[in-house]
Amino acid sequence: MRLFLLALLATLAVTQALVKEEIQAKEYLENLNKELAKRTNVETEAAWAYGSNITDENEKKKNEISAELAKFMKEVASDTTKFQWRSYQSEDLKRQFKALTKLGYAALPEDDYAELLDTLSAMESNFAKVKVCDYKDSTKCDLALDPEIEEVISKSRDHEELAYYWREFYDKAGTAVRSQFERYVELNTKAAKLNNFTSGAEAWLDEYEDDTFEQQLEDIFADIRPLYQQIHGYVRFRLRKHYGDAVVSETGPIPMHLLGNMWAQQWSEIADIVSPFPEKPLVDVSAEMEKQGYTPLKMFQMGDDFFTSMNLTKLPQDFWDKSIIEKPTDGRDLVCHASAWDFYLTDDVRIKQCTRVTQDQLFTVHHELGHIQYFLQYQHQPFVYRTGANPGFHEAVGDVLSLSVSTPKHLEKIGLLKDYVRDDEARINQLFLTALDKIVFLPFAFTMDKYRWSLFRGEVDKANWNCAFWKLRDEYSGIEPPVVRSEKDFDAPAKYHISADVEYLRYLVSFIIQFQFYKSACIKAGQYDPDNVELPLDNCDIYGSAAAGAAFHNMLSMGASKPWPDALEAFNGERIMSGKAIAEYFEPLRVWLEAENIKNNVHIGWTTSNKCVSS
C-alpha cells in the first residue's frame, strides 16, 4: 500500500509539474509568436525589395536577413526540446510546438544554408532576366517573357515562329541553370534528412497531414483522366485541321508550342481555333474592357467589391499604398509573376503583378485577392497559424470567385458582356473554354511535383534528368516539345515555380477543391440546384451572397489552427477531398465530347513521344 501511495504521489507531482510547465509554455508561445511575426516581417520586406527590384545589393540584403532568421529558428527549435509538449493536455499547444519543430531549410548548417539561398537567387534571377531576340529582327534582343514572348506564344499561329520562341526561352530559362539545380536538389535532400524526412518529397507532402495524400491524388486524377483524354483527342483533331498532318500527327502527343502557353499548362488561348462551335461567340471581354477604359486599378477595385459584397473584409489602405499593380516603366528588373504577400503585421498585405487589361488577368486579380482575403481573415491567429489549412486551400479561394466572375451571368451583370445568347451550343463553348484551363491544368500540375519528387527521392539517374521530365509530360499530358531535346538541355527550370523552389501540388489540390468550394457556395447562395435546369452549376454567380461569405469566413479565419479536413468541414460539412464536384460541373461537356469524338472518328490517347533522347 505504501509503495502504491508513493507511486501515486510521484505521479501527482509529475502531473502538477507538467500542468505548471504547460502554463509556462503557453506564455512562452505567446511571446515567441509575436517575435516571429516581427522577424518574418523584416525578412518579407527584404524579399519584397528584391522581388520588385532585382539588384545585387537587394539580393545580398535579402539573403543576409534570411540567414539571420534561419539562425533564430534553430535556436527556437533547440528551446522547444526543453518542453515536454508531446505530453500536454492542450491540443492547440501541441500543434503549435509541432509546427515550430519543422525547420525546413533552416536546419542546414550555416554555410549550406547560405549556399542554398545563393543558388535559389541565381535561378530565380536567371528566370526573371531572360531576354530573347525577335524572330523577324535578330538585332532586336530585348524581348522578355512577360509580356512580349507570352504575347507571341498566345497569339501567333505560325508554327515555325512559335517553335523558335519556345526553343530560345527554354534554352535560356532552363538549360542555363542545370548546375545550380543539381546543387539545389542535393541541399534540399540534406535539409529534408535533417528534418527527419526520407527526402524533400516527404517534407513537401507533410504539409497535407495525411500519409495517403499522394495516393488520393492519383485516384482522383485517374477518375478525371478519361475526360482529359477526350479533350486532348478533340484538340489534336482540330489542330490537325488547322496546321495539317505534317505538323500534328493523328495519334501522337500534341506539339506543345501550338497550345497557346509556354508550358502547355492551359490551352484557352487557342480557343479561337479549337472551339466546338466557331460560329457561336466565345466569352472574351478583353476588348470590351479596353473599350470601357478599364485600368489595372479598376480591376483590383472590382475584385475588392466582390469580396465586400459577400460581407468579407475590405482591402486596407496599406494594400493600395504599397502594392505594385503595373509593370514599372523605369527599366528595372523585377519578378513579374503575380504574387500576394503577407507582412505579418496588421493589415499590411500587398500584391505584385504586372497587370494587363485582359479577361484572363481579371481572373488572376481575383485569384491573388483570394490570398489577400485569407491573410486578412486569419491575421488574429498566432504567427504559426497564419497560413492556409493546407497549401491548396490558399490557392483555391480566389479561384472560386474567378469561376463566378467568368460566368456569362456575372459578366452581363457588370456590363462587360453584351448581346450574349446562352443556348446549348454557347454553353458547350463556354464549358470547353473553362476545361481548357481547369481540366488541362491537372496533369500538368501533377507532373511538376511528380518530377521533383522523383529527383528528391533519387529515383532518376542524373544522366536522364531531362528526358525523365519529358517522359512524365508525355505520359500524363500527351504533349511533347517542338524540337528534339537531349541531356545537353535541361528544361524543367524554364517553369518559374521550379526555378524558384515553389511546391506545385498546392495548385493541383486547389483545382480539385475549388470546385468543391464553388458547388457548396453556389448551393448556399441559392444559385445552383441539380434538379433545376434554370440554375446550372456552370452559370452560378455568388456575388452578393452573405451566406457564401459566412462559410468562407468560418473556414478562412481558422488559418492552420486545425487540420485541413476540419477547415473543409467548417465550410461545407465535408471532410474528404473529392473529384465529384469537378465531374458534375463538366458533365454536359463530357457527354457532348464523347459523342462528337465518335462521330469524327477521333483517336483517343497517344503514342509515346520520341522527342527526348538520352545521349
Curated annotation (Swiss-Prot):
Subcellular compartments: Secreted, Extracellular space
What SUPFAM superfamilies would the database entry show? Metalloproteases ('zincins'), catalytic domain (SSF55486)
EC number(s): the record gives 3.4.15.1
- What GO cellular-component annotations does this UniProt entry give? extracellular space; plasma membrane
Q: Which residues form the active site?
A: 368, 497
**Cofactor: binding details:** Binds 1 zinc ion per subunit.
Domain Peptidase M2 residues, every copy: 19-607
Q: How is its activity regulated?
A: Inhibited by captopril and, to a lesser extent, by lisinopril, trandolaprilat, fosinoprilat and enalaprilat.
Phenotype caused by lack of the gene: Male flies are sterile.
Which cofactor names does the annotation list?
A: Zn(2+)
Keyword Endoplasmic reticulum listed: no
The protein's name: Angiotensin-converting enzyme
Gene for this protein?
Ance
